[in-house]
Amino acid sequence: MFKFVMVFAVLGVAAAGVAHVPHPQVSHPVGRSEDVHAEVKSEHSDVRADGFDADLLVSNSIQQASSGDVHGNIHGSFSWISPEGEHVEIKYVADENGYQPVGAVLPTPPPIPEAIARAVAWLEAHPQAPEPVHHSHH
């Protein structure tokens, strides 16, 4: 019983010590000074039985627009001015294939090597027949 009490006492002290560890304050410079006082310049939303349309314009040049249909497909875009002063825009589709963003600032995968592309095309043109399943009775 004494060991049992000691184990829980040690665990309690350890947990209390972890709870009082100070967390350093980290400053994250984000955005621009005018972002702090940004105001909504226009906002519109129209929700209907067959879908919706919505858009937003903020005084610091942030914009958002989207529309959706009754099947859950959404098309939209959002944009802002980067800290470097560049206009950044992302267009997207969200549907049964997932979220598909497109924009110049997004990374793109390298091209598929020609040999791999030929191999994939050959495999698609020559599908393998399923192998028969053999059951052995013992």
From Swiss-Prot:
Q: Which residues form the signal peptide?
A: 1-16
What is this protein called in UniProt? Larval cuticle protein 1
Enumerate the spans annotated as Chitin-binding type R&R domain: 49-110
Phenotypic consequence of V13L = In strain: 0101.3, 0101.4, 0101.5, 0101.7, 0101.9, MSH22, MA28, MA32, MSH38, SP138, SP235 and SP295
**Which PROSITE patterns does the annotation name?**
CHIT_BIND_RR_1 (PS00233), CHIT_BIND_RR_2 (PS51155)
* Pfam annotation, one family: Chitin_bind_4
Instruction: List the source organism.
Output: Drosophila miranda (Fruit fly)
Does the record carry Aminoacyl-tRNA synthetase as a key word?
no
Q: What is the lineage of its organism?
A: Eukaryota, Metazoa, Ecdysozoa, Arthropoda, Hexapoda
Task: Quote the annotated effect of F52Y.
Answer: In strain: SP235
- GO CC annotations, alphabetized: chitin-based extracellular matrix
